[in-house]
Amino acid sequence: MKLTKTALCTALFATFTFSANAQTYPDLPVGIKGGTGALIGDTVYVGLGSGGDKFYTLDLKDPSAQWKEIATFPGGERNQPVAAAVDGKLYVFGGLQKNEKGELQLVNDAYRYNPSDNTWMKLPTRSPRGLVGSSGASHGDKVYILGGSNLSIFNGFFQDNVAAGEDKGKKDEIVAAYFDQRPEDYFFTTELLSYEPSTNKWRNEGRIPFSGRAGAAFTIQGNDLVVVNGEIKPGLRTAETHQGKFTAKGVQWKNLPDLPAPKGKSQDGLAGALAGYSNGYYLVTGGANFPGSIKQFKEGKLHAHKGLSKAWHNEVYTLNNGKWSIVGELPMNIGYGFSVSYNNKVLLIGGETDGGKALTSVKAISYDGKKLTVE
């Protein structure tokens, strides 16, 4: 699809351009939101979520390439799994799926895909924590996983709902009790986890010095880790951002400034934002929240998003010299897609937009310090 070239001023006088002449990527065969993916060499892998038990690949270096379906994922349909690539293979962990009773449940299994023979293998291991709302990235020979919901609490909520049957009164009581808790009482994962495929071992890489998160944007570039926002309890996000660094003594963390609020709006934090690097600049965009939830929480309302409507966003933020700024906007709101850094661009693959509609689009954004380009 060709876009008309347009320029306008944005915050800090950055130029925002729709590019009509750059490479475009084909749409996904199906809309994929709440899925996962990874980059292996020049090939991107995306699947699961609203894509069912399917995975698709695209050769990014071939301008004429189309998406291709690979072997069916053997772990069944699931939402919000975690994936990363190590040593030319794709690893998929956890997620949320229905059991034989029809209950939505967190699962903690693990699978490996080998591109050389198009085969999946279930691994003889289980994640030590719940992996829904978790975010993963690879570094060296390990997969690092940050955040996630508590398996027992999350599963218990869905089990109780199914057990309540058609009793609306009981269901309302279960929902009220679930959301009327402090953030710390959900026991979101507060350790940085790692999985090393060569030894099939999980490792506790240390406690993070900030609250547990679900749906945070999490990236690793070189020795730097960046964490942006995420839920601190169901329905309530935070605007906090953090940076870590791999050192001989483990990961050392520091706080970054909060994500700024768009002009005329409050900043209620983001979950499901997409992030990556372009020309050395860290970019984060999209995500969803409940505007007004932080205000209600500060007023003492533990069910912070009660009565509020979910909103999806399109602002593009960049981190430069430890400071955040808004450098432009996407042509649509987006969240809960897959993002990957490639060829000095951040590809935004699938996701959802207003009302939760699944997207098939593949957009590319780039930033050179002065101009944001959206393709």
UniProtKB/Swiss-Prot annotation:
Organism lineage string: Bacteria, Pseudomonadati, Pseudomonadota, Gammaproteobacteria, Pasteurellales
UniProt keyword annotation of Repeat present: yes
Cellular localisation: Periplasm
Gene3D superfamilies assigned to the protein according to its UniProt record, in alphabetical order: Kelch-type beta propeller
Subunit structure: Homodimer.
Principal EC category: isomerase
The EC number(s) this enzyme carries: 5.1.3.24
MF terms in GO: racemase and epimerase activity, acting on carbohydrates and derivatives
The species this protein was found in: Haemophilus influenzae (strain 86-028NP)
Pfam family for this entry, one: NANM
CC terms in the record's Gene Ontology section: periplasmic space
Main location: periplasm
Signal peptide: 1-22
Free-text function comment from the UniProt entry: Converts alpha-N-acetylneuranimic acid (Neu5Ac) to the beta-anomer, accelerating the equilibrium between the alpha- and beta-anomers. Probably facilitates sialidase-negative bacteria to compete successfully for limited amounts of extracellular Neu5Ac, which is likely taken up in the beta-anomer. In addition, the rapid removal of sialic acid from solution might be advantageous to the bacterium to damp down host responses.
Protein name: N-acetylneuraminate epimerase
Primary gene name: nanM
Domain of life of the source: Bacteria
